[in-house]
Regions:
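Blade-terminus and WD-like Trp-Asp/Gly-His loop motifs, strongest in beta-propeller folds
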Residues: 30-39, 43, 74-83, 155-165
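Short loop/turn segments that connect beta-strands within beta-propeller blades
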Residues: 2-5, 53-56, 133-137, 183-187
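Predominantly five- to eight-bladed beta-propeller fold
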Residues: 5-6, 13-18, 61-64, 68-76, ...
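Short consensus segments that form the blades of beta-propeller domains
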Residues: 38-40, 116-123, 168-172
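Short glycine-/Asp-/Thr-/Trp-enriched loop segments that recur within the blades
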Residues: 22-25, 66-73, 147-153
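Long hydrophobic segments that form regular secondary structure
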Residues: 133-141, 146-171, 184-186
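Extended hydrophobic/aromatic segments used for targeting, binding, or gating
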Residues: 169-193
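Structural motif
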Residues: 45-49, 93-100, 126-128, 174-181
Length: 193
């Protein structure tokens, strides 16, 4: 009788990003074309830029991005192509947990895998959703009072009318989680809490 084998499927970096714990790939995502195809948004020197498709002219939207407080390359265009949304990220030193896959199906030698794993009390990455008007460069950044104790915040998504972004917020300790609407004209408000 053959022994039963236990197979453990480890998350890929993309899956880990969904939990808000892995932020390295937020620096290197591909440029994003606007819905009307007139612009491309991208990260350069830790800041958000847009480039006109027709002329190649670049315009810097954010001015305060640094290595220790940078803008995510996961940029979302509003459906009307007038604004972009992203998150400003304060990264932290990461801790990892390691797993040994003792009997991989594709080779004889064991494989070592690692996954980012913050311990209780460790500082976590901090994200602030933000909106930039492409034409004027005007920025709208919410007060972080309502989500200062974040475990994670997802990348913002635009509502179909281009008037607000929605993001998921999970409080550290998981006592509070929900979706938030951020309207540039108003404060952030909880939805479905």
């Amino acid at each position: 009788k053959s022994a039963d084998r236990l197979k453990v499927t480890l998350p890929t970096p993309r899956q880990t990003t969904a939990t808000g714990m892995e932020t390295d790939d937020e620096k290197t995502a591909a440029p994003v074309t606007s819905p009307d195809k007139k612009y491309t948004a991208f990260i350069k020197n830790h800041n958000i830029y847009v480039k006109e498709t027709a002329t190649g002219k670049e315009k810097q939207l954010s001015l305060d991005g640094t290595l220790g407080n940078y803008y995510s390359a996961y940029i979302r265009w509003s459906p009307d192509s007038k604004k972009v949304a992203s998150c400003k990220i304060r990264p932290v030193e990461k801790r990892y947990v390691y797993y040994v896959e003792s009997s991989p199906s594709d080779q004889l030698q064991p494989k070592l895998h690692k996954q980012e794993y913050a311990k209780p009390g460790d500082e976590l990455p901090f994200k602030i959703p933000c909106i930039y008007d492409v034409e004027t460069g005007h920025s709208v950044i919410p007060s972080t009072d309502l989500f200062s104790q974040q475990y994670y915040i997802t990348a913002p998504e635009w509502n179909s009318d281009s008037q607000a972004i929605t993001f998921e917020y999970n409080q550290r300790g998981h006592q509070s989680t929900g979706y938030w609407n951020f309207l540039p004209q108003q404060e952030s408000t909880p939805v479905n809490r």
